């Protein structure tokens, strides 16, 4: 599907700086695995005192050992060595970049992985919040913090498990999809896209969706993630979700590619939800406040 040429100009600042989602992180893990597997770690250098989130084990235990692969769990990258794994969360403004220059004071530098030869990997973070960071975790404790807080990975969720979860929660589906405790890897864009593909109002309550709704959501997750991954794998670097093509996200005012109705948005809890009235809400336009009877 081709996006409107206006697509790139539509997202708000907050949307453009959203935390990278599963497609961006997975494709970047694949790129880094291809480029850095087998490279021996010489040094891990944090540039700020907040960059390294753990005290033990020390990063030095991986020095001289080859990188086995770069994996992913939810929105986290995992640099896997034999004794430890470096878990990296990019937050909103972070990137893990191939670092050819290895400047002593890199702009927005948070931490650097230096290898015995070739380029380094540089964790950067734009802005002032400085929330991106690295956890050095023993491999036998990899299921502990911070990954223990995550729900099942988005691509591993089954219709049966999701229906069971829906039955025990009473959340708006858009918020449920973005809650990393419920499903790991989705964010604002994918929540918009999944709701549209599943033909579900973004404010439908999970407790009312049932098995049929759960099956529709799982199918929509796979379709939206597969489309995002296909796009990300054409790139040589990590995009932001604002760059990635979608059906409704960032396309407010455009015609819906499914039915032709105008894509609309509603502000909710500080972010923008995009939806198609015909496909998702029975033609009803959601009021731009949380007290609307259509949001209940």
Label every PLM stretch briefly.
Residues 15-131:
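Surface-exposed binding/hinge segments that line
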Residues 40-61, 71, 163-296:
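Basic, nucleic-acid-binding surfaces and adjacent catalytic neighborhoods in DNA/RNA-processing proteins
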Residues 15, 82, 86-197:
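Phosphate/anion-contacting hairpin/loop surfaces
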Residues 10-11:
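N-terminal polybasic/positive-inside topogenic patches
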Residues 19-22, 26, 156, 210-218:
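Generic detection of long, well-ordered alpha-helical segments
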């Amino acid at each position: 599907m081709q996006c409107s040429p206006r697509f790139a100009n539509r997202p708000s600042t907050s949307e453009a700086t959203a935390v990278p989602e599963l497609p961006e992180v997975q494709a970047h893990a694949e790129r880094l695995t291809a480029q850095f597997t087998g490279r021996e770690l010489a040094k891990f250098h944090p540039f700020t005192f907040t960059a390294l989130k753990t005290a033990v084990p020390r990063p030095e235990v991986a020095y001289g050992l080859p990188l086995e692969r770069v994996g992913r769990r939810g929105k986290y990258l995992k640099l896997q060595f034999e004794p430890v794994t470096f878990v990296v969360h990019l937050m909103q403004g972070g990137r893990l970049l191939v670092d050819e220059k290895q400047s002593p004071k890199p702009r927005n530098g948070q931490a650097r992985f230096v290898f015995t030869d070739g380029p380094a990997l540089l964790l950067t973070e734009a802005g002032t919040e400085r929330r991106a960071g690295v956890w050095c975790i023993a491999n036998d404790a990899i299921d502990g913090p911070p990954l223990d807080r995550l729900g099942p990975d988005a691509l591993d969720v089954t219709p049966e498990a999701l229906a069971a979860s829906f039955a025990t929660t009473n959340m708006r589906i858009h918020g449920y999809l973005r809650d990393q405790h419920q499903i790991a890897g989705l964010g604002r864009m994918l929540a918009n896209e999944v709701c549209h593909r599943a033909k579900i109002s973004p404010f439908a309550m999970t407790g009312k969706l049932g098995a049929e709704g759960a099956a529709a959501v799982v199918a929509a997750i796979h379709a939206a993630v597969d489309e995002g991954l296909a796009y990300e794998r054409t790139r040589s670097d990590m995009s932001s979700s604002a760059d990635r093509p979608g059906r409704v996200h960032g396309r407010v005012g455009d015609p819906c590619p499914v039915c032709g109705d105008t894509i609309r948005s509603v502000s909710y809890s500080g972010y923008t939800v995009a939806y198609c009235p015909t496909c998702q809400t029975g033609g009803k336009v959601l009021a731009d406040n949380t007290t609307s009877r259509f949001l209940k």
